[in-house]
C-alpha cells in the first residue's frame, strides 16, 4: 500500500485523490494520509508565511516514514532542490490560467473603478493594478468555498484565483472570465502537481513515474528555472507560462519546441517587464535561465529589489 500524504483541504485531497486513483488503476494499491501544514493553521497573508509553508510538513512526513509519497501543488514547492527528496512524477497539467469570479457575471473590464477585488497573490495584485482599471485590491485567504462566498455575500465584487483549482472542485460554472496570459501571466507551475518521494526510494519512484507527463515536466522545469534564477520565492510578483508546441521545419517535418513567456511586475502595477523565448523540451532549464537573463537586462533586478522592501509585503 502506497501511503500518499496530502494537505487536508478539499482541493488538496481532490488533487491527491486523483493521483491515488491513477495509481490504483495501474494496479498499485494506494491510500491518502492527511497532514496539517503551517499554512493551513495560519490565517495570515501567504507572502508573510515564508517559502515552503504548505510543503514542509508533508516532506517531514516522508522523511519520518509516516507516508511514502506526497502530492504538492507544484507552485508551492521551494525552487531550491532538496537532495532528500525526488519529484518522481509531474502528472499532466490542468489549465494554468487565472480566472475571475465576479458579481453579476461581469468580466474585469466591466467592473467600475473602485471595485473590490480579492486575491491571495502579490503576482496577481501587481498585474491587476497594471491593467489600469482602478480596481481596489484586497487580501484573500481561506479555502475556495470561503473565497467564492466573499463574492456571493457581497463582501467583494470579484476574486481572482487559479482556474485549475476551480476545475478540480467542479466549480467552473462560477467563472465569469478566464484571463489569457497576455492579460495575466500565471504563477510558475500553476495548475501542475508534484508527486514527491524519498530520493533513495528508486522502486517507488519508478512506480510513481508512470504518472509523469513529459510535456508538463518540460514546461514546469522552464518556468521554475526562471523563477529560481530571479530568486523570487513563491510569493514574489513573477509570472511565467511555458508550453510545448509543434512546429514544421523547412522540409515539412514536424518537431516540438518549448515556448516560455515570463514577467516581473512592480507591486503597485506601475511597471511590468516581459520577455519570452523558444527552446527545446530537452533543454527546458536552459530556456528558463535565458528568459530570466533577458528580464534582468530589461531591469527586473531593480523592480524586484523594490518589491522585496515594499512595506506591503511585510518584509
Curated annotation (Swiss-Prot):
What's the name of the protein? Porphobilinogen deaminase
Which ranges of the sequence are coiled-coil?
Answer: none
Tell me if Methyltransferase is a UniProt keyword of this record: no
**EC nos:** 2.5.1.61
Modified-residue entries (S-(dipyrrolylmethanemethyl)cysteine), positions: 234
Which pathway is this protein engaged in? Porphyrin-containing compound metabolism; protoporphyrin-IX biosynthesis; coproporphyrinogen-III from 5-aminolevulinate: step 2/4
**Gene Ontology cellular component annotations, sorted alphabetically:** cytoplasm
Q: Please provide the Gene Ontology terms (biological process) for this protein.
A: protoporphyrinogen IX biosynthetic process
Q: What family does the entry list?
A: Belongs to the HMBS family.
Query: Cofactor comment in the record?
Result: Binds 1 dipyrromethane group covalently.
Transferase as a keyword?
A: yes
- Supply the NCBIfam families for this chain: hemC
Which InterPro entries does the entry link to? HemC (IPR000860), Porphobilin_deaminase_cofac_BS (IPR022419), Porphobilin_deaminase_N (IPR022417), Porphobilinogen_deaminase_C (IPR022418), Porphobilinogen_deaminase_C_sf (IPR036803)
Which source organism?
A: Mycolicibacterium paratuberculosis (strain ATCC BAA-968 / K-10)
Amino acid at each position: 500500500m502506497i501511503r500518499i500524504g496530502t494537505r487536508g483541504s478539499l482541493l488538496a485531497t481532490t488533487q491527491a485523490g486523483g493521483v491515488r486513483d491513477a495509481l490504483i488503476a495501474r494496479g498499485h494499491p494506494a491510500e491518502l494520509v492527511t497532514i496539517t501544514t503551517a499554512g493551513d493553521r495560519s490565517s495570515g497573508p501567504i507572502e508573510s508565511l515564508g517559502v515552503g509553508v504548505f510543503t514542509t510538513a508533508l516532506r517531514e512526513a516522508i522523511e519520518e516514514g509516516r507516508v511514502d509519497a506526497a502530492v504538492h501543488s507544484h507552485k508551492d514547492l521551494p525552487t531550491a532542490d532538496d537532495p532528500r527528496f525526488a519529484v518522481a512524477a509531474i502528472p499532466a497539467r490542468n489549465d494554468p490560467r487565472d480566472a475571475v469570479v465576479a458579481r453579476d457575471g461581469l468580466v474585469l473590464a466591466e467592473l467600475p473603478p473602485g471595485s473590490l477585488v480579492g486575491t491571495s497573490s502579490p503576482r496577481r495584485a501587481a498585474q491587476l493594478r497594471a491593467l489600469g482599471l482602478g480596481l481596489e485590491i484586497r487580501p484573500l485567504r481561506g479555502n475556495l468555498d470561503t473565497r467564492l462566498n466573499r463574492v456571493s455575500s457581497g463582501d467583494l465584487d470579484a476574486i481572482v484565483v487559479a482556474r485549475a483549482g476551480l476545475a478540480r472542485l467542479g466549480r467552473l460554472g462560477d467563472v465569469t472570465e478566464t484571463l489569457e496570459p497576455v492579460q495575466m501571466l500565471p504563477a510558475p507551475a500553476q495548475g501542475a502537481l508534484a508527486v514527491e518521494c524519498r530520493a533513495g526510494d528508486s522502486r517507488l519512484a519508478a512506480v510513481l513515474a508512470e504518472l509523469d507527463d513529459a510535456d508538463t515536466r518540460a514546461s514546469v522545469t522552464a518556468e521554475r528555472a526562471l523563477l529560481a534564477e530571479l530568486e523570487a520565492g513563491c510569493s514574489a510578483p513573477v509570472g511565467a507560462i511555458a508550453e510545448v508546441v509543434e512546429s514544421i521545419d523547412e522540409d515539412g517535418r514536424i518537431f516540438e519546441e518549448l515556448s516560455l513567456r515570463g514577467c516581473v511586475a512592480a507591486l503597485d502595477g506601475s511597471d511590468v517587464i516581459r520577455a519570452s523565448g523558444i527552446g527545446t523540451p530537452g533543454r527546458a532549464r536552459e530556456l528558463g535561465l535565458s528568459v530570466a537573463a533577458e528580464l534582468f537586462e530589461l531591469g527586473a533586478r531593480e523592480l524586484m529589489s523594490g518589491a522585496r522592501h515594499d512595506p506591503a509585503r511585510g518584509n
